[in-house]
From Swiss-Prot:
Record keywords: Calcium, Disease variant, Glycoprotein, Metal-binding, Muscle protein, Phosphoprotein, Sarcoplasmic reticulum, Signal
Keyword Glycoprotein: yes
Outcome, altering residue 33 to Q: In CPVT2; reduces calcium-dependent dimerization
Major localisation: other
GO molecular function: calcium ion binding; calcium ion sequestering activity; calcium-dependent protein binding; protein homodimerization activity
Record localization: Sarcoplasmic reticulum lumen
Name of the protein described by the UniProt record: Calsequestrin-2
GO biological process: cardiac muscle contraction; cellular response to caffeine; detection of calcium ion; intracellular calcium ion homeostasis; negative regulation of potassium ion transport; protein polymerization; Purkinje myocyte to ventricular cardiac muscle cell signaling; regulation of cardiac muscle contraction by regulation of the release of sequestered calcium ion
Length: 399
């Protein structure tokens, strides 16, 4: 899994004027909190923390650009370590050359990756290398893997979570063997997939849950899937979630953006750009939801929704690469290998496609009628046209 990561520092520098108390954004204080890990100090360091965050890097070269890139990543980790100093989270560096034996023991195989050790689990962080993203990711990871719901207000909050995969189960108590299996299954997917449980009969009734039953909610779907053959073992729950882990409509998130991008279907993604905070973007997203609900049983369909507001530093890159305007809703098919793309023609914001028109376009993509090779042909035509124009110009000059 080799790629060039886009590392975004995410550090904001305060102006010289004094900030009001309560709004002092953290800046690096110069104290070293990130240490080098070796076989000699590994066990000692591991015992000190509930989570251990390890940056596995190649030896720092003499190249100035490479050195600066490494220093930027180091500063990000130092700031995160500073912000989370009150938590039981440790931060270390692992040199791929000096500590090759330790890296092999830990199963590290990709230089430039960030790994988190939690108990007997190793989680690879596959998102945007930015301080705010890392802090949120680690705070989610340090929490209990299952959140308990015990009131009507908490049910309402649960129901409003629509853009994550989520599961909820009804169990007799925390001592139930079936709850323990559910909890252990949750650890496999934390923090990417949300696991909830209730021991309250009233909550279970409101959610139409039977004892020891678990419901699986796909993002943006109105109705859940009741996992069959209850009660379940840990292995059965893990297997079911893995089989249903690619939703019909999913959101690209900073904390898992690279992993999501690599989870393509036959080398392509159907990508939709829409700003949820914008009226036209919101309307387009609602149309996408309707299409996803109508086609949730199609295993070949997975639409990747990107809210440009989540990735402000990538907007200009995407507009240049895909030749589109991200201030308007867009949907297209993207080749993940070379970023070739073809985009649906949407005349203007006041004339967004209907769900039926969008379904027809998607069917053409899935059938191969619309594909990124068309984009290559268009580029070739443009090149040929330019050459012909140049030839004509040369002829005129000769005359």
């Amino acid at each position: 899994m080799k790629r060039t990561h886009l590392f975004i520092v995410g550090i904001y520098f305060l102006s010289s004027c004094r900030a009001e108390e309560g709004l002092n954004f953290p800046t690096y204080d110069g104290k070293d909190r990130v240490v080098s890990l070796s076989e000699k100090n590994f066990k000692q360091v591991l015992k000190k923390y509930d989570l251990l965050c390890l940056y596995y890097h190649e030896p720092v070269s003499s190249d100035k650009v490479t050195q600066k890139q490494f220093q930027l990543k180091e500063i990000v980790l130092e700031l995160v370590a500073q912000v989370l100093e009150h938590k039981a989270i440790g931060f270390v560096m692992v040199d791929a050359k000096k500590e090759a034996k330790l890296a092999k023991k830990l199963g590290f195989d990709e230089e430039g990756s960030l790994y988190i050790l939690k108990g007997d689990r190793t989680i690879e962080f596959d998102g945007e290398f930015a301080a705010d993203v890392l802090v949120e990711f680690l705070l989610d990871l340090i929490e209990d893997p299952v959140e308990i719901i015990s009131s009507k207000l908490e049910v309402q909050a649960f129901e409003r979570i629509e853009d994550y995969i989520k599961l909820i189960g009804f169990f007799k108590s925390e001592d139930s063997e079936y709850y323990k299996a559910f909890e252990e299954a949750a650890e496999h997917f934390q923090p990417y997939i949300k696991f909830f449980a209730t021991f309250d009969k009233g909550v279970a009734k409101k959610l139409s849950l039977k004892m020891n039953e678990v419901d699986f909610y796909e993002p943006f779907m109105d109705e859940p899937i009741a996992i069959p053959n209850k009660p379940y073992t840990e292995e059965e729950l893990v297997e079911f979630v893995k089989e249903h882990q690619r939703p019909t409509l999913r959101r690209l998130r900073p904390e898992e953006m690279f992993e999501t991008w690599e989870d393509d279907l036959n080398g392509i993604h159907i990508v939709a750009f829409a700003e949820k905070s914008d009226p036209d973007g919101y309307e387009f997203l609602e149309i996408l939801k309707q299409v996803a609900r109508d086609n949730t049983d199609n295993p070949d369909l997975s639409i990747l929704w990107i809210d440009p507001d989540d990735f402000p530093l990538l907007v200009a890159y995407w507009e240049k690469t895909f030749k589109i305007d991200l201030f308007r809703p867009q949907i297209g098919v993207v080749n993940v290998t070379d970023a070739d793309s073809v985009w649906m023609e949407i005349p203007d914001d006041d004339d967004l496609p209907t769900a039926e028109e969008l379904e027809d376009w998607i069917e053409d993509v899935l059938s191969g009628k619309i594909n990124t090779e068309d984009d290559d042909e268009d580029d070739d035509d443009d090149d040929n046209s330019d050459e012909e124009d140049n030839d004509d110009s040369d002829d005129d000059d000769d005359e």
